[in-house]
C-alpha cells in the first residue's frame, strides 16, 4: 500500500502553481525580441518612408569614398611599443600605445609624457600688477539733482557735469571752482561730450533734445531732432565729425555734426540703449542696452557686426580701454571684458554685487565700477583682480539711500577719478601717494581655473 505525504490544501495549490510556471512560464512570459526593441516599427518606417534614399546617388557616394580614403591615408599608424623590464623578465605588457617614432618624454623621464605632470598653460594665471589704493580728495557741491553725466575737456583744464536739475555746470578741474552754468534743457541732462577738435559741447537729456553748445559764446547753435523718447547717452567719433546718440526708443542715431542730418538709424535693440561708445577701428560703435545685449556696429554699412548675449540683466554701462583693443560691459552684479573686433569673451570681473551704473578705465589698467548703493570697486584690468573696495559717503543732510554712484570718468592723466552721485555732489578721488607694495600688498592667490561664463 502506497503512503502519500500529508500536505495541506494551501501547500498543494502552491506546488501546483509553481509547477505550472515551470512548464509554461518560459514560453508565455517572454516578450518577442522584435517587439521589445521596436525592430518591427523601424523596419516598416525604413521601407515606407526611406526606401527612396536607401542608396546614395553615384556622384555623392564616390565623393564620400574619396574623403574616407584620404582620411585613412593621413592617419598615422599606431603601434604598441614594448621595452625590456628592469629585472630582465621579458617585454613590458604596458597598455600605453604611442605613435611610431622617438618617445616624446623629453628630459622629464624616458617615455614619460610631460602633459601628465605639468599644468597646461591655459590654466596658468597672470599675477596682477600692484596699484595704489584710491582716496577721497575733494567734494564739490552745487547741483540740485542727481549728477547723471560727466565729461572732461581734452586739455584737462575743466570738466562739465549734467544733473537732474536740468543744468550743465562747468568746473575748474584743479580747484573745483564753478566757472559757468548752462541752462536750456527742460528735463534731466543724461549725456555730455566735449569735442576734441571744435569748441563744442554736446548734451542730451530726457526731454528728447540733443544740443550743440558753442563754448565761445556759451549758446546753443544746433539741435538734432529725431529721437522719439528720452536720449540717455551720446558719444563723438574720435576722427570723424559724427555724433552718435541712443535712448529709450531703442535705437542709436548717427548724425553729421555740422549739417544735422541723420546718417544712420541703428535699430536692433529691444530695450533702452543705456550706453554707447565710439572708437577709430571696427567696431566703430558699441552699444549696450537694457535688453541684456551688447551690439557691435559696422559704421559704414549701418548694420550689426555681432551681438553679445552673455549678460543676464540689462547692460547699463560700457568702458573702452584707451590703449588696448578691448572693452568692458557692466550689468547688475556682472562685469565682463571683451576683445575687439569680434567681441571675443576674455574674462569676468567677479565680486561687485550691485546695480552697476558707471564704468571707467585709465591708461594704468585700473578699472573703476560704481554701484547704485554707493559701493566702489577698483580692478586690475589685465587679470580681473579687485584690489580695493570702498563705500562712498553721502553728504550731511542726505539720506543713506542717496549714496549712489550715477556717473564716473577719469581725467586725461588717469590720476583723478570724478564721480557724480545721487546725493547731488561731485567727488574727486586720487591715488594714495604714501602707499607702497609693502604697506598695501597684493593679497592674491591663483586658482585652478578661470570661470568663463
Curated annotation (Swiss-Prot):
Record key words, sorted: Cytoplasm, mRNA processing, mRNA splicing, Nucleus, Repeat, Spliceosome, WD repeat
Cellular component terms per the entry's GO annotation: catalytic step 2 spliceosome; cytoplasm; Prp19 complex
InterPro entries in UniProt: G-protein_beta_WD-40_rep (IPR020472), Prp46/PLRG1-like (IPR045241), WD40/YVTN_repeat-like_dom_sf (IPR015943), WD40_repeat_CS (IPR019775), WD40_repeat_dom_sf (IPR036322), WD40_rpt (IPR001680)
Gene3D superfamilies in alphabetical order: YVTN repeat-like/Quinoprotein amine dehydrogenase
Region described as Disordered: spans on this chain: 62-129, 432-453
Pfam family, any one: WD40
PROSITE patterns on file: WD_REPEATS_1 (PS00678), WD_REPEATS_2 (PS50082), WD_REPEATS_REGION (PS50294)
Low complexity: bias regions: 62-71
Gene Ontology annotations of biological process type: mRNA splicing, via spliceosome
Keyword hit for Cytoplasm: yes
Keyword Repeat attached: yes
Renumbered ranges of WD repeats: 142-181, 184-223, 226-265, 268-309, 311-350, 351-389, 400-439
Subcellular location: Cytoplasm; Nucleus
Origin: domain of life: Eukaryota
Protein family membership: Belongs to the WD repeat PRL1/PRL2 family.
Function, as annotated: Involved in pre-mRNA splicing and required for cell cycle progression at G2/M.
Subunit field text: Associated with the spliceosome.
Protein name per UniProt: Pre-mRNA-splicing factor prp46
Amino acid at each position: 500500500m502506497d503512503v502519500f505525504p500529508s500536505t495541506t490544501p494551501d501547500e498543494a495549490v502552491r506546488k501546483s502553481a509553481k509547477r505550472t510556471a515551470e512548464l509554461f512560464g518560459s514560453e508565455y512570459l517572454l516578450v518577442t525580441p522584435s517587439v521589445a526593441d521596436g525592430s518591427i516599427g523601424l523596419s516598416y518606417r525604413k521601407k515606407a518612408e526611406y526606401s527612396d534614399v536607401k542608396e546614395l546617388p553615384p556622384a555623392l557616394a564616390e565623393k564620400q569614398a574619396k574623403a574616407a580614403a584620404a582620411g585613412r591615408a593621413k592617419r598615422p599608424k599606431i603601434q604598441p611599443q614594448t621595452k625590456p623590464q628592469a629585472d630582465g623578465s621579458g617585454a613590458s605588457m604596458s597598455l600605453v600605445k604611442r605613435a611610431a617614432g622617438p618617445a616624446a618624454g623629453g628630459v622629464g623621464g624616458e617615455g614619460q609624457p610631460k602633459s601628465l605632470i605639468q599644468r597646461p598653460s591655459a590654466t596658468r594665471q597672470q599675477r596682477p600688477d600692484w596699484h595704489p589704493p584710491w582716496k577721497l580728495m575733494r567734494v564739490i557741491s552745487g547741483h540740485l539733482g542727481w549728477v547723471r553725466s560727466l565729461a572732461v575737456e581734452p586739455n584737462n583744464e575743466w570738466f562739465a557735469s549734467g544733473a537732474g536739475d536740468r543744468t550743465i555746470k562747468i568746473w575748474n578741474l584743479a580747484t573745483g571752482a564753478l566757472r559757468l552754468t548752462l541752462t536750456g534743457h527742460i528735463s534731466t541732462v543724461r549725456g555730455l561730450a566735449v569735442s576734441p577738435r571744435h569748441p563744442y559741447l554736446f548734451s542730451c537729456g530726457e526731454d528728447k533734445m540733443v544740443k550743440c553748445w558753442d563754448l565761445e559764446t556759451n549758446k546753443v547753435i544746433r539741435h538734432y531732432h529725431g529721437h522719439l523718447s528720452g536720449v540717455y547717452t551720446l558719444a563723438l567719433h574720435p576722427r570723424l565729425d559724427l555724433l552718435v546718440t541712443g535712448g529709450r526708443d531703442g535705437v542709436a542715431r548717427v548724425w553729421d555734426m555740422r549739417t544735422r542730418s541723420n546718417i544712420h538709424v541703428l535699430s536692433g535693440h529691444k530695450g533702452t540703449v543705456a550706453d554707447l561708445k565710439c572708437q577709430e577701428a571696427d567696431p566703430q560703435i558699441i552699444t549696450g542696452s537694457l535688453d541684456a545685449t551688447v551690439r557691435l556696429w559696422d559704421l559704414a554699412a549701418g548694420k550689426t557686426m555681432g551681438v553679445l548675449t552673455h549678460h543676464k540683466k540689462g547692460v547699463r554701462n560700457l568702458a573702452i580701454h584707451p590703449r588696448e583693443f578691448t572693452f568692458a560691459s557692466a550689468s547688475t552684479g556682472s562685469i565682463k571684458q571683451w576683445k575687439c573686433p569680434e567681441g571675443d569673451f576674455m574674462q569676468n570681473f567677479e565680486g561687485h554685487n550691485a546695480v552697476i551704473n558707471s564704468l571707467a578705465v585709465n591708461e594704468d589698467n585700473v578699472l573703476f565700477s560704481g554701484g547704485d548703493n554707493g559701493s566702489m570697486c577698483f580692478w586690475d584690468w589685465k587679470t580681473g583682480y579687485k584690489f580695493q573696495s570702498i563705500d562712498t559717503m553721502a553728504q550731511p543732510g542726505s539720506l543713506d539711500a542717496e549714496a549712489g554712484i550715477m556717473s564716473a570718468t577719469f581725467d586725461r592723466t588717469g590720476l583723478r577719478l570724478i564721480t557724480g552721485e545721487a546725493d547731488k555732489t561731485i567727488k574727486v578721488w586720487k591715488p594714495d601717494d604714501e602707499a607702497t607694495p609693502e604697506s598695501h600688498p597684493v593679497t592674491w592667490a591663483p586658482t585652478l581655473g578661470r570661470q568663463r561664463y
